[in-house]
């Protein structure tokens, strides 16, 4: 059994005798019968620790309890453990074990009049009831056969025996709105159920692969249909000859066998559709060959374009180098040229021009030298 949770705002009292415990239990049963007759929705809790249950037909292991105490002035601070009592309780025998340091002060005896005059617990005070901090423990089932539950009171077990469990359970929840430190929904979300994807994946694969596998059957359906029709019409030669023979051989084949009009019509229909099928296959083959040739030509043109772009870049670089060399040559030539006064010519005012015979002349800019024979 897990350790008893720590009790807050309670004092440790002396031990309760067994005789007084049985008398208090009978008194409490009388109080509950009175409240049920009056239809009062009062909290079914006691101010003392669990009562002694009557022995069950089978042997019960002696439970061990940690020392817990009750403060009589606190007014039903925590619900006591629940014990399911049998239908008839003629007497309460003494127990071979004790409940630890659980007691009721002697100076304040419990009587029927005192319990009736005692004020009922405040509902707002019940909201301060907290659960023990730590790992959350699973909640006990209110309909369980266990009599050692620490989360339910004796009154709840008596109500479940005497009246409808659903109505009493809803009233109990309204009277005691206890907030749990954890929620049940995260636990359900933490372990989702992945059952649909395994069943949907094979179906999706089968649906996608079904038409692909059925294509060979569709392709051979025409041939099998022609063969069945030829067998039904009792054609004396196979369908392969009807389709593949040249025109002359096909006419000779028809002349060898006496065929009716319906048989001739069927043979010509089979040959026509077979030739159309062969022509369609040849057309598709030619289209594929043309596509392959165009792809190869496109690759060749792409490589040629790249080669021409590289050549153009090299030509541009060579032209830029030649322009730089020409500018340097102009500068050197104009540095060596002098007029009659010994002054140098400016490249901004004069330019060098070459005649048809190869002679070079220095002329001012903006003037053209006339061609001489």
From Swiss-Prot:
A motif (PXY motif 2) lies at residues 79-83. A motif (PXY motif 1) lies at residues 61-65. The keyword Nucleus applies. Phosphorylated on serine residues. In undifferentiated erythrocytes, phosphorylated by MAPK8 which then leads to ubiquitination and protein degradation. InterPro entries: bZIP (IPR004827), bZIP_Maf (IPR004826), bZIP_sf (IPR046347), NFE2-like (IPR047167), TF_DNA-bd_sf (IPR008917). Residues 266-329 form the bZIP domain. SMART domains: BRLZ (SM00338). Residues 291-298 are annotated as: Leucine-zipper. One of its GO terms (molecular function) is WW domain binding. Changing residue 157 to A: Loss of MAPK8-mediated phosphorylation and no protein degradation. Pfam families: bZIP_Maf. Keywords: Activator, Cytoplasm, DNA-binding, Isopeptide bond, Nucleus, Phosphoprotein, Transcription, Transcription regulation, Ubl conjugation. It is found in: Nucleus, PML body; Cytoplasm. Residues 204-225 are annotated as: Disordered. GO terms for biological process: bone mineralization; cell population proliferation; cell-cell signaling; gene expression; labyrinthine layer blood vessel development; negative regulation of bone mineralization; negative regulation of cell population proliferation; negative regulation of syncytium formation by plasma membrane fusion. There is a cross-link at residue 368 (Glycyl lysine isopeptide (Lys-Gly) (interchain with G-Cter in SUMO)). CDD domains: bZIP_NFE2-like. Residues 1-206 are annotated as: Transactivation domain. Homodimer; can bind DNA as a homodimer. Erythroid transcription activator nuclear factor erythroid-derived 2 (NF-E2), composed of a heterodimer of NFE2 and MAFK, possesses transactivation activity on beta-globin. Also forms high affinity heterodimer with MAFG; the interaction promotes erythropoiesis. Interacts (via the PXY motif 1) with ITCH (via the WW 1 domain); the interaction promotes 'Lys63'-linked ubiquitination of NFE2, translocates it to the cytoplasm and inhibits its transactivation activity. Belongs to the bZIP family. CNC subfamily. Component of the NF-E2 complex essential for regulating erythroid and megakaryocytic maturation and differentiation. Binds to the hypersensitive site 2 (HS2) of the beta-globin control region (LCR). This subunit (NFE2) recognizes the TCAT/C sequence of the AP-1-like core palindrome present in a number of erythroid and megakaryocytic gene promoters. Requires MAFK or other small MAF proteins for binding to the NF-E2 motif. May play a role in all aspects of hemoglobin production from globin and heme synthesis to procurement of iron. The PXY motifs are required for binding WW domains. PXY1 is required to promote transactivation of beta-globin and for hyperacetylation of histone H3, but not for binding to the HS2 promoter site. This is Transcription factor NF-E2 45 kDa subunit. It comes from Mus musculus (Mouse). The gene is Nfe2.
